[in-house]
């Protein structure tokens, strides 16, 4: 082999090895961005939710509260079950299911009052518990199940 062919082979081999080294993934923790909680984008001006899961839970509560107001106006008493609310306002048959994704809904109704709670499957700063009754105010708590004494969600 001539000297120029040998030099050319060495250069090509060097370039191939360099490309192969740079194409490999870095080991875990090297050059990787730190894992952070995704930033929540509010759904509307004044949105009190801290995550998409909270936004869905609060939206569900607002639908139930509006349906109860409409039901009470029409029948002069509150619905005693979620099934009674079907077709009141925008409350649908599928909404009777208490499994609401990251939350579980609990409804206790009487003709003169009701209590609705949304309990997260894992409570943390982005998954607070929520509570509402017939006054329509939604209360929230990030450390324990929310109740009437918990702060009102703004």
Where do the protein language model's features map onto the residues?
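Bacterial N-terminal signal peptides that target proteins for export
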Residues: 1-11
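Conserved catalytic core of two-component sensor histidine kinases
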Residues: 58
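Bacterial N-terminal signal peptides
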Residues: 9-20
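Extracellular/periplasmic head regions of type IV pilus-like filament subunits
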Residues: 25-52, 63-69, 73-127, 132-137, ...
